Amino acid sequence: MEKTMLEQKLENTILPLLLKKELINKIISEKIEDENIIRDIISETVKSYERTLVEPNESVGVVAAQSLGEPGTQMTMRTFHYAGVAELNVTLGLPRMIEIVDARKEPSTPTMTVYLTEDYAFDKSKAEEVAKNIESITVQNIAQDIHIDMVKLAINVVLNPESMKQRNITADDVMEAIKKKMKLKIEQEGNILRLIIKTPSLKALRKRIPKVKSIHLKGVPNIPRVIVKKDDTMGEYILHSEGSNLSAVFEIDGVDMVRTTSNNIVEIQDVLGIEAARNAIINEISGVLNQQGLNVDIRHLMVIADIMTADGSVKSIGRHGLSGEKASVLARAAFEETVKHLYSAAEKGHSDKLSGVVENIIVGKPISMGTGCVDVYIDRDYEEGKDLMITVEKEEN
């Protein structure tokens, strides 16, 4: 059947535009010509769509909250290994769920899943090369020892030639990086770099050792480890990192920017935007639930992600986020810090329109949800007309 004829048949249905297009493409691809079959397909699709719609005035927020809260009580408090990568530890279970809904700026165990482009994804040596380019290398990684020379009152950095060769770093690179970060004189004796400060003292030298160890030489900052793992289903190599730095990783050759992601939702918002952050919230919560063997309809998670990102930035669900910013004074007071909210509202002369659920319950009024959203009254004209029809029927008989 032609596309235009199918469009005409679907024109007056309640199906959304994208669903109509998908249904048309399916019918055409399956080469269905029988009009009766097409009519039945459209009818069943419309019925299925109507069943998925939420009833008018349904409290979707409450349903979403209990649908996520109830499985949350069954979650474990422990931290598991990450999806078969024994070397990396990632927070899972209830602690991870709390991190997500609290919109923490930095997760307790930030990680990235780095996908590679086709040229690199199926070649192990190329994948390892990308991993080396990403992995952050500090002075500590290429030094055998870093200690204080008590005789000359200096810091001795004993370089490891093998580590430097593997990572393609020279002594000059190390000296240049140290000079950029610290104002001091450097003397080289073979594999030893002697760092001399202007006013040497034991206290001053001890204070500088941690800084020397953490000086960045190569790779992406904040990513101390990268592990290459082969995906058995796709046959491609995927990189798992400890630490997260999306914007810097995107600049490295061989990284697939479309699929690469992080578990740091606030970072995703800053780098990719609020829609990407919304998707990340859904995927992260869904991943936590699936790992625990808990099945929650994704639409509940979508409601939570929508409300967390509704005003263009990721906000937590709590007194410092959504609950603390409600328009209703009574709703804010009912959640936490009751006296503070009531004092503040009284001082500023705020009023409450009693438009939400909590505030109406507090004052003992019906809530504006479900049947509380509609008024019921008797249509007397209809009743009189009905009586008249019965009378007429009796006279005719």
Curated annotation (Swiss-Prot):
Protein name listed in UniProt: DNA-directed RNA polymerase subunit Rpo1C
Subunit annotation: Part of the RNA polymerase complex.
Keywords recorded for this protein, A-Z: Cytoplasm, DNA-binding, DNA-directed RNA polymerase, Nucleotidyltransferase, Transcription, Transferase
Record's catalysed reaction(s): RNA(n) + a ribonucleoside 5'-triphosphate = RNA(n+1) + diphosphate
Organism ancestry: Archaea, Methanobacteriati, Methanobacteriota, Methanomada group, Methanococci
Pfam families according to UniProt: RNA_pol_Rpb1_5
Broad class of where this protein is predominantly found: cytoplasm
Protein role: DNA-dependent RNA polymerase (RNAP) catalyzes the transcription of DNA into RNA using the four ribonucleoside triphosphates as substrates. Forms part of the jaw domain.
Molecular function in Gene Ontology: DNA binding; DNA-directed RNA polymerase activity
GO BP, one annotated term: DNA-templated transcription
Organism: Methanococcus aeolicus (strain ATCC BAA-1280 / DSM 17508 / OCM 812 / Nankai-3)
GO cellular component: cytoplasm; DNA-directed RNA polymerase complex
Domain of life of the source: Archaea
Record's subcellular location: Cytoplasm
Family of this protein: Belongs to the RNA polymerase beta' chain family.
EC number: 2.7.7.6
